[in-house]
């Protein structure tokens, strides 16, 4: 099985400007993500950016860059442009890895690609069991429920499924563990163009979850439990400092 990893890396960030180039132990953040993707065994790793500063930094460490439009409204639109510009075949597997996850385990990058390869779905993703009571009711921890074959039934910021009897007894964490969605996706390349040409659905607007568009239009997303739970990504200066400390401790 061969697959390509695309890493969107926008320079502008409201809470952390210049995020892809943030220094972590002497390397820009985007290089850490790139190296994790290489370790996953990807055939090709492409960094998609709309900023020359990011492109220049990637050239320094020998990565591959695809310059994209600054006008995309979503990461998936940027992904579709990469597929078109790089001439990626319709049946090829493309994994979208966020550019702000320098500690993402290579094992789950490969796992989501293998998940899609073993499925008839056009798209695959991963989840982890929720083990924290805070996460159960946290709208930023997106939940996913699946059918018996592992295909997503719904994604929500709400607490799903709602364990009526357990919650009535005051039991939040039960043996019927909820699953938190991890924002890593594998696509069949030809499906990406189909996806971005669909009009946004009412459900995705309500939940602010773009993946609901796929279910709305009757397509499937296969979900597996991740082999490893990835550390949190970098959204704020505080997150960045935490990642720096983790990497410093490892070295």
Swiss-Prot record:
Statement: the UniProt record of this protein carries the keyword Nucleotidyltransferase: yes
CDD domains given in the database record: CMP-KDO-Synthetase
Catalysed conversion reaction: 3-deoxy-alpha-D-manno-oct-2-ulosonate + CTP = CMP-3-deoxy-beta-D-manno-octulosonate + diphosphate
GO biological process, one term: CMP-keto-3-deoxy-D-manno-octulosonic acid biosynthetic process
GO cellular component, one term: cytosol
Keywords: Cytoplasm, Lipopolysaccharide biosynthesis, Nucleotidyltransferase, Transferase
Group of enzyme by EC: transferase
GO molecular function: 3-deoxy-manno-octulosonate cytidylyltransferase activity
EC numbers on record: 2.7.7.38
Localization of this protein: Cytoplasm
Listed pathway(s): Nucleotide-sugar biosynthesis; CMP-3-deoxy-D-manno-octulosonate biosynthesis; CMP-3-deoxy-D-manno-octulosonate from 3-deoxy-D-manno-octulosonate and CTP: step 1/1; Bacterial outer membrane biogenesis; lipopolysaccharide biosynthesis
NCBIfam families, A to Z: kdsB, PRK05450.1-3, PRK05450.1-5, PRK13368.1
Function noted in UniProt: Activates KDO (a required 8-carbon sugar) for incorporation into bacterial lipopolysaccharide in Gram-negative bacteria.
Name assigned to this protein: 3-deoxy-manno-octulosonate cytidylyltransferase
Organism: Vibrio vulnificus (strain YJ016)
Name of the gene encoding the protein in the UniProt record: kdsB
């Amino acid at each position: 099985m061969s697959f390509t990893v695309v890493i969107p890396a926008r320079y502008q960030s409201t809470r952390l400007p210049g995020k892809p180039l943030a220094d972590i132990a002497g390397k820009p953040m985007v290089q850490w993500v790139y190296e994790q993707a290489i370790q996953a065994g990807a055939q090709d790793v492409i960094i998609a950016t709309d900023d020359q500063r990011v492109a220049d930094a990637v050239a320094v460490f020998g990565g591959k860059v695809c310059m994209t439009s600054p006008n995309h409204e979503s990461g998936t639109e940027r992904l579709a442009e990469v597929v078109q510009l790089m001439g990626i075949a319709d049946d090829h597997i493309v994994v979208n890895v966020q550019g702000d996850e320098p500690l993402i385990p290579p094992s789950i990058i490969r796992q989501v690609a293998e998940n899609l390869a073993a499925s008839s779905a056009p798209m695959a993703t991963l989840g982890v069991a929720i083990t924290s009571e805070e996460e159960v009711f946290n709208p930023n921890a997106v939940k996913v429920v699946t059918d018996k074959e592992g295909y997503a039934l719904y994604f929500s910021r709400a607490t799903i499924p709602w364990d009526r009897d357990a919650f009535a007894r005051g039991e939040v964490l039960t043996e019927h563990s909820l699953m938190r969605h991890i924002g890593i996706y594998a696509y069949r390349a030809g499906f990406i163009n189909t996806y971005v040409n669909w009009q946004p659905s009412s459900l995705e607007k309500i939940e602010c979850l773009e993946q609901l568009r796929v279910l709305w239009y009757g397509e499937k997303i296969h979900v597996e439990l991740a082999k490893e739970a990835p550390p949190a990504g970098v959204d704020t200066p505080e997150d960045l400092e935490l990642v720096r400390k983790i990497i410093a401790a490892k070295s």
